[in-house]
């Protein structure tokens, strides 16, 4: 089975459709994990939500989603996102199929921003090197934070909400930290840094800040048999400039 990982559509459903179409995603035999940031920048976060509700097996939240969820002013932030606050809270606190901050697929750790070297000890000592246990710990800590609704001033020292946590982390040269050692990761949040792929840190942010002047572009990862590959490019477009979808994803455009 293949697992598609897509992130950072930011209100542009095309970034999800294009990735699934390019890879020939088949919901009958493939899985899809969405790795955060549905809101802000683009005009149609509801369209992004419709796609992930239909196709994603797991949904992770990103820092922009949490900005809406906990009423945190971040840049850029679109006013329409505030209307999704109750929806996001319900999803995060759902008893089953909850939206989370981390998951592990075939030994590969998936989060929105990445897990930093700050967590090396936690993975090895508290979780015995098991990425699934680390994901469970991160998720439990996140849910507890959402239930408590911490003030912004408390975020700096919070293990999930701080700049070193899996919602906000940016690796060198943006911070002093490197990715968690010895564990493959697929992440969004930060524009790709190719030099980090040899560290098994695979970055799939499609750079929604560039807009959709190129309507067929995509960037995503596929996990299969414990290996990760990143795909980036653009679909062929018809004369109207609309992406040409593959047949198995025809319904995604309806």
Residue ranges and their predicted role:
Residues 5, 59, 108-117, 185-187, ...:
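Short hydrophobic-aromatic micro-motifs
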Residues 231-242:
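Short, solvent-exposed aromatic-acidic interface loops
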Residues 108-177:
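Active-site-proximal loop/helix segment associated with metal-binding centers of metalloenzymes
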Residues 10-14, 40-43, 64-70, 116-118, ...:
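Active-site environment of divalent metal-dependent phosphoester hydrolases
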Residues 1-4, 103-110, 198-199:
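Beta-strand-turn-beta hairpins that frame and shape the catalytic cleft
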Residues 2, 6, 11-87, 91:
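Core catalytic region of metal-dependent phosphoesterases/phosphodiesterases
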Residues 172-231:
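Conserved beta-sheet core of the metallophosphoesterase superfamily
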Residues 60-61, 65-133:
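Flexible, acidic/histidine-containing loops and adjacent segments that form or flank the divalent-metal
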């Amino acid at each position: 089975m293949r697992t598609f990982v897509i992130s950072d559509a930011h209100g542009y459903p095309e970034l999800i459709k294009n990735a699934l179409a390019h890879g020939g995603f088949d919901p009958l035999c493939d899985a899809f994990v969405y790795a955060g940031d549905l809101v802000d920048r683009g005009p149609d976060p509801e369209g992004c939500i419709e796609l992930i509700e239909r196709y994603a097996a797991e949904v992770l939240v990103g820092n922009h989603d949490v900005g809406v969820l906990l009423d945190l002013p971040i840049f850029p932030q679109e006013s329409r996102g505030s209307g999704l606050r109750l929806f996001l809270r319900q999803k995060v606190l759902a008893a089953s199929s909850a939206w989370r901050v981390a998951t592990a697929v075939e030994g590969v750790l998936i989060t929105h921003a990445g897990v930093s070297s700050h967590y090396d000890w936690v993975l090895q000592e508290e979780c015995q090197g098991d990425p699934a246990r680390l994901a469970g710990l991160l998720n439990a800590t996140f849910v507890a934070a959402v239930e408590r609704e911490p003030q912004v001033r408390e975020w700096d020292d919070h293990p999930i909400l701080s700049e070193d946590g899996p919602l906000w982390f940016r690796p060198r040269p943006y911070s002093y930290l490197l990715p968690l050692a010895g564990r493959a990761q697929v992440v969004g949040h930060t524009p790709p840094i190719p030099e980090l792929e040899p560290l098994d840190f695979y970055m799939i942010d499609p750079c929604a800040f560039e807009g959709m002047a190129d309507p067929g572009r995509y960037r995503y990862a596929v996990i299969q048999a414990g290996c990760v590959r990143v795909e980036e490019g653009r679909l062929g477009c018809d004369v109207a400039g609309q992406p040409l979808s593959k047949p198995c994803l025809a319904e995604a455009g309806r």
